[in-house]
């Protein structure tokens, strides 16, 4: 029988121990890391050039490693050993840690190892999505949190989303669901700042535990420690569902960045259950010093005075409001002091009303052209009837011209007719003052009416128009000081003026249509004229025509308030 030594000789080299996988350890990379930590990126590039090795780190990776590197303080091992509860182990290569792992004191779902959790199912979400919901990843995470009943376990690199945290806090406070949160050590300060801004103190939450987590640690011969970061992201709910992917709980990932998320359920969740318990055992609590520093910084930011925006240049609307405020505080001041400035401000506001006025004038002019067409009537009455129609039309046109030729101030002041009538009944001194300013506008309107009408009948209608314009100008002179009163807004005045004009034009239009219908019906009975039955029929029509002409001549006097 062969002994053990002979059996070992027969075994080929490396047969008992498996060969190490290639590229698992590289001494050249370790030396390059030493050069990077001690001398910076230039020293590392020089080393790689001397060794004729390609670069294995990008510029962002170099900066990240230098930012995570820290000099290991003396006595670090002694401090870690003193933190242990039982330091009786003297094994050179211990298979258990001397530091006791943290306990999941808030509870955990009672799943035994290998217990069946259902058929594995996968739901895939991409963001941004092109379906009914754009932000599917965020909505899927919030739906999982709302459905939690037993436990919520979260591992995240960066957590600053207010909406998701509110859902977690609501489940913790209202439904009393245990919550475990593991965050990257370098990003936990941002999470604490968000909590304090929302008015939540995590150290006082009875159903929430927040701990720090780091990646792998790399030690160099010079005593430098490089701490890795956490890139794991998953949300475990009730031990039966888990959401994982590259989606972080931040506003930028929720609104700007593209990401994906997998929602898993069934037996595959057991792997994430075990991984979370391992990570929770490796985590560290948040120090009281860090909590106090974050709290004091947030309080200092809240106490800082808000910087007011720089003063802007005054605009047209602000100047108008200032002038109205001044006049409302002193309503007895004279109108001429502010008339020039108010003219410039009102032109822009009155542009819409002026356009409607011009369109209405065009409608009246069109009706005038339609009415001037000669109609076949009786020989002894046709000319007089046409002349009468022209008289009525010229009267309305003169009234329109008299109104449009007035200044902007007079047109705007004419909207205060109701207010003027009130003032006449209560304040007699103001009415006597306003009547002294009427001759100038009366003469201007009279000249306009005389130029637009040449016959004697048109002159009488023009005098009537000038009389009405005189009254309106009196009211405008009186209402100059009362126009700025706050109980009569400028917009309401324009609306009232537009309604009055529309009603006035509709009245004139109805009168003209009535006259056209009368003349048309008169032309449809030629047999009566040829059979010498005209006197009886013509007498009846002449009375109707006479009444229509009188009504049309007085059409200017029809106002909505009469």
Curated annotation (Swiss-Prot):
The keyword Cytoplasm applies. Residues 425-472 have a biased composition (Low complexity). Residues 424-472 are annotated as: Disordered. It holds the Pfam family SACK1. CDD domains: PLDc_FAM83D_N. GO terms for biological process: cell division; cell population proliferation; metaphase chromosome alignment; positive regulation of cell cycle G1/S phase transition; protein localization to mitotic spindle; regulation of ERK1 and ERK2 cascade; regulation of TOR signaling; signal transduction. One of its GO terms (cellular component) is cytosol. PANTHER family: PROTEIN FAM83A-RELATED. May regulate cell proliferation, growth, migration and epithelial to mesenchymal transition. May also be important for proper chromosome congression and alignment during mitosis. This is Protein FAM83D-B. It comes from Xenopus laevis (African clawed frog).
